[in-house]
């Protein structure tokens, strides 16, 4: 790690963007060259966030169109869906590595993408992006120039589900995912639905069976099970906390499989993981993961015969977004996977 790579963060003023910048500041391999946004050009990040000290990030906000791509090795795109693909179309031949945190390159089937997100300006580039679920696609990520980081809900569902379907331990029908997310998952834009009086002391379900992470989850489960047309009952819920995500997953066991077998399979599958752990006590609370890149999975027998309940928690802004992006960056750079990701979080 004797050299540094020049990095640009596009969308640096959003929650995901500022978390990414915070992590990269502690990365010995990174030199932050550009921070880009669409507003407040020329300002410092400290003018957007009170907890950011003025001298800690001396790089001022730039307009993306004004940056010199020849001075950039890696670009992180922390943009709303539908904006990253326009940038990628212009720069994919000019930048060594692109790590996209939007949904623009997650969905491999263009018709499915259009159904959920609308038109895509460079569908021919979708297959060039590796789906950045780190522990599943580690080898592919290492060899790739382009990575599409998973959504937060998708991460919390797929980390436990992918190995279980691949190993044929649970049925691919009747999968139910009930997920709760902190409000930061809805982004930083001004919206009446996110005002304090609208969310305080309130739990709200939204986009039931219509959330855009559904096709992403179903796509990866089809890949895992080597079959087509796996559908998931997915209910996202907004809870009145800043950050954190907890997913409760309800599954039917294959014949002869017990919850003990499920737990053992997950232990073996993730035995070498630096961030994913099987721990029932820590899995049931977001307190275990806030401010970290960790993911805890708990396995519990269902009251209904031949069923199992799995609980999975992550920090939606870290393992669900910026943390996983840095983890993927580390793999692509052939440096220690945990670099810049082991800082002790606040109490």
Curated annotation (Swiss-Prot):
Query: Which pathway does this chain act in?
Result: Amino-acid biosynthesis; L-arginine biosynthesis; N(2)-acetyl-L-ornithine from L-glutamate: step 3/4
**CDD domains cross-referenced by the UniProt entry:** AGPR_1_C, AGPR_1_N
Q: Which GO terms describe its molecular function?
A: N-acetyl-gamma-glutamyl-phosphate reductase activity; NAD binding; NADP+ binding
Entry EC number(s): 1.2.1.38
* Name the record gives this protein: N-acetyl-gamma-glutamyl-phosphate reductase
GO annotations under biological process? L-arginine biosynthetic process
Family per record: Belongs to the NAGSA dehydrogenase family. Type 1 subfamily.
The primary site where this protein sits is cytoplasm
- Keywords recorded for this protein, A-Z: Amino-acid biosynthesis, Arginine biosynthesis, Cytoplasm, NADP, Oxidoreductase
Family matches, as Pfam families: Semialdhyde_dh, Semialdhyde_dhC_1
Functionally, this protein is described as follows:
Catalyzes the NADPH-dependent reduction of N-acetyl-5-glutamyl phosphate to yield N-acetyl-L-glutamate 5-semialdehyde.
Q: Which InterPro entries match?
A: AGPR_AS (IPR023013), AGPR_type-1 (IPR000706), NAD(P)-bd_dom_sf (IPR036291), NAGSA_dehydrogenase (IPR050085), Semialdehyde_DH_NAD-bd (IPR000534)
Organism for this UniProt entry:
Ehrlichia ruminantium (strain Gardel)
Show the active-site residues.
152
Q: Where in the cell is it found?
A: Cytoplasm
């Amino acid at each position: 790690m004797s050299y540094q790579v020049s990095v640009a963060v596009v969308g640096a003023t959003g929650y995901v963007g500022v978390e990414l910048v915070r992590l990269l500041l502690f990365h010995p391999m990174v030199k932050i060259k550009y921070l880009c946004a669409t507003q407040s050009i020329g300002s410092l990040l400290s003018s957007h966030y009170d907890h950011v000290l003025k001298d800690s990030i001396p790089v001022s906000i730039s307009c993306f169109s004004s940056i010199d791509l020849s001075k950039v090795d890696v670009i992180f795109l922390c943009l709303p869906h539908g904006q990253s693909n326009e940038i990628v179309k212009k720069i994919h031949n000019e930048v060594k590595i692109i790590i996209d945190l939007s949904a623009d390159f997650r969905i491999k089937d263009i018709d499915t993408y259009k159904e959920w997100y609308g038109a895509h300006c460079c569908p021919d580039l979708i297959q060039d992006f590796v789906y950045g679920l780190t522990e599943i696609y580690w080898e592919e990520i290492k060899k790739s120039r382009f990575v599409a980081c998973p959504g937060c809900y998708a991460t919390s569902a797929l980390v436990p589900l992918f190995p279980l379907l691949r190993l044929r331990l649970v049925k691919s029908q009747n999968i139910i995912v009930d997920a709760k997310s902190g409000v930061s998952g809805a982004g930083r834009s001004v919206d009446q639905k996110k005002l304090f009086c609208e969310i305080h002391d309130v739990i709200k379900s939204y986009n039931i069976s219509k959330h855009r992470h559904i096709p992403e989850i179903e796509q990866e489960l089809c890949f895992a099970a080597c079959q087509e047309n796996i559908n998931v009952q997915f209910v996202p819920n907004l809870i009145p906390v800043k950050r954190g995500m907890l997913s409760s997953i309800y599954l039917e066991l294959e014949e002869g499989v017990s919850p003990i077998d499920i737990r053992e399979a997950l232990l073996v599958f993730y035995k070498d993981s630096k961030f994913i752990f099987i721990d029932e006590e820590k899995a049931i609370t977001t307190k275990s993961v806030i401010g970290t890149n960790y993911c805890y999975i708990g396995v519990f027998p269902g009251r209904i015969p031949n069923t199992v309940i799995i609980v999975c928690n992550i920090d939606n802004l870290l393992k669900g977004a910026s943390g996983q992006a840095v983890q993927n960056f580390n793999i692509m750079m052939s440096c220690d996977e945990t670099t810049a990701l082991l800082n002790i979080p606040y109490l």
